[in-house]
Amino acid sequence: MDSGCWLFGGEFEDSVFEERPERRSGPPASYCAKLCEPQWFYEETESSDDVEVLTLKKFKGDLAYRRQEYQKALQEYSSISEKLSSTNFAMKRDVQEGQARCLAHLGRHMEALEIAANLENKATNTDHLTTVLYLQLAICSSLQNLEKTIFCLQKLISLHPFNPWNWGKLAEAYLNLGPALSAALASSQKQHSFTSSDKTIKSFFPHSGKDCLLCFPETLPESSLFSVEANSSNSQKNEKALTNIQNCMAEKRETVLIETQLKACASFIRTRLLLQFTQPQQTSFALERNLRTQQEIEDKMKGFSFKEDTLLLIAEVMGEDIPEKIKDEVHPEVKCVGSVALTALVTVSSEEFEDKWFRKIKDHFCPFENQFHTEIQILA
């Protein structure tokens, strides 16, 4: 054939002309799997591979943690951390998480939270951040700090808004928070009595930090401070003013309890809605857990004593985004966006989270929040 007519790519591979290997007759060779004895990693190893040696030490730490020997596990993890290469990111994350969990079990919560905060700052994808947030949740739960526990759950939900189990945990946390805040208000009222030594009547609201879930002023507005005159003509007036403020405080305690119950109820309803949407996709034990949880929620909802139209409105608000988005969340995508952009996906405060999810409900059912400050100014 003329070389000028030869088509590029028209040549044959040499393998076309090669003979195929003959098949061996008889049964195939048996597969011999490597069997490891229990606790095989405790045996002496003469491996020159540093990574393998550190991996064996990690297995020892994991077993000690499993046995609840947290001090021993912490020692193993710490010895690995000192020798681990700075480029071995995967094992470094695992080891640091192990250290944090051991420290939490040993009562060293602040050290555990420092490690968790460091891991959060270095997270580069949603999987890493999710793991760190669950770690923080475990530490705060061990610390029995309700507000921090709730904030951890809020951050998890902002990252995975269609996870029903985190919404359920948030609802339970709100249920526990309500009585705690109400009791704190009552206790503060008893401890901080009104005094006239500085000729002012001081507020007995508890101190509210920047990240408090329900913020109360440390003192009443300037206009609400009542001057206490020494003469008896103003005594009756001052007593009446004190009584009015105490009544307002009692109403405030009741409002705090109702607000937290409303948030708990809304979170339970959101949980139930998400479970109902995922129910057709589930079978076996997953479906059993789903149905059992829905029944438990139904039983707890009876204790709220909210009217049916109230529950319907809450369900409407908490389910606004579900029909369009739930299908996209069945197989969530792992987003690798870098630590800075990843931070933007997570809520920065409880106020921001609650404003997003509960503002419509609160405005409809809790008008007392704005009314309270108005009443105080009128009394002044």
UniProtKB/Swiss-Prot annotation:
InterPro entries: DUF5588, TPR-like_helical_dom_sf. This is Uncharacterized protein C8orf76. SUPFAM superfamilies: TPR-like. Coiled coil: none annotated.
